[in-house]
Regions:
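Catalytic-core regions built around general acid/base machinery
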Residues: 40, 88-99
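Glycine- (often His-adjacent) and acidic-residue-rich active-site loop
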Residues: 49, 57-93, 111, 223
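Terminal peptide-recognition signature
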Residues: 18, 22, 36-37, 55, ...
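Short, active-site-adjacent cap segments at secondary-structure transitions
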Residues: 60-64, 111-113, 134, 216, ...
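Crotonase-fold acyl-CoA enzyme core
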Residues: 94-209, 242, 256
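Conserved CoA-thioester-binding segment of acyl-CoA-metabolizing enzymes
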Residues: 1-58, 94, 191
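Helix-loop "lid/cap" segments that line or gate small-molecule binding pockets
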Residues: 163-164, 215-219, 234-240
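Amphipathic alpha-helical segments at domain termini/boundaries
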Residues: 1-17, 21, 169-202, 210-220, ...
Length: 261
């Protein structure tokens, strides 16, 4: 396998697989990897040929969090450098969370700290049975600050109180119960489960999926009031009037597959 720390592979269907490729350090991330991931997510988001993005890790781990050498350098750095560094992590997670295509976390093993944050920032997560998760920052005197918006959105504030404060590891089964992952499978079934999700996602309209992601962000946590009613009314009206919406409705009436399939 290439020694590049981040790999991007795209197939004819428009499925892009982004792989954190540092198996010797369990795919821990440093400033270089963070920059490469941000560029990958941003670039794939505007690539019209990309339909779906799958995020995974090389070897037996998904992502073991921050690289120890990088953490050591940051511990010796000043406040300004630390703030700038933390903002790059925030920007990476945000670029993944706001990527206007469906994203799948293919969790092939351990996901610690920032690794858990990457899982939470994906739309759908599938994990192997032996995967272990941990929001472990407090155990080394830190806080899970940059990942917190995504992890709290995934597991809720109540569960976050436990796992943010204890830093204890939890299993894939617990991650499923908490809502962090959607499906837990045997290691041998991981690729099949991801492929099944890909096939299901490819059946949807790409523009409607992008709109659906924006809609979730717009309505989550908001009270149902006149402004929200208008937002949702405009959303469906715009979708109906769009070329993709018209094609989808006509294909349904004609009992044929829409053009995007």
């Amino acid at each position: 396998m290439s020694e590049a720390p981040v790999l991007i592979a795209k197939d004819a269907r428009g499925v892009a697989t982004v792989t954190i490729n540092r198996p010797n350090v369990r795919n821990a991330i440093d400033d270089t990897v963070i920059g490469l991931l941000t560029d990958a997510f941003t670039g794939l988001g505007v690539d019209g040929a990309t339909r779906i993005v799958v995020l995974t890790g090389s070897g037996s781990a998904f992502c073991a969090g921050a690289d120890l050498g990088w953490m050591r350098r940051m511990a010796a750095a000043g406040e300004r450098e630390n703030v700038a560094s933390a903002k790059t992590i925030s920007a990476m997670l945000r670029s993944l969370n706001e990527l206007p295509k469906p994203t799948i976390a293919r969790v092939n093993g351990a996901a610690y700290a920032a690794g858990t944050g990457l899982v939470a920032a994906c739309d759908i997560a599938v994990a192997v049975e032996q995967a272990v998760f941990s929001i472990s920052e407090v155990r080394i005197g830190l806080t899970p600050s940059t990942i917190s918006p995504y992890v709290v959105a995934a597991i809720g504030a109540r569960a976050a109180r436990r796992y943010f404060l204890t830093g204890e590891p939890f299993s894939a089964a617990d991650a499923s119960r908490l809502g962090l992952v959607h499906q837990v499978v045997a290691e041998s079934a991981l690729d099949g489960a991801v492929e099944s999700l890909i096939a299901t996602l490819l059946a949807g309209g790409p523009q409607s999926q992008s709109r659906a992601k924006r809609l979730i962000a717009d309505v989550a946590g908001r009270p149902v009031d006149d402004a929200l009613e208008m937002l949702t009314a405009r959303s469906i009206a715009d979708a109906r009037a769009s070329p993709e919406g018209r094609e989808g409705i006509q294909a349904f009436l004609d009992k044929r597959k829409p053009a995007w399939r």
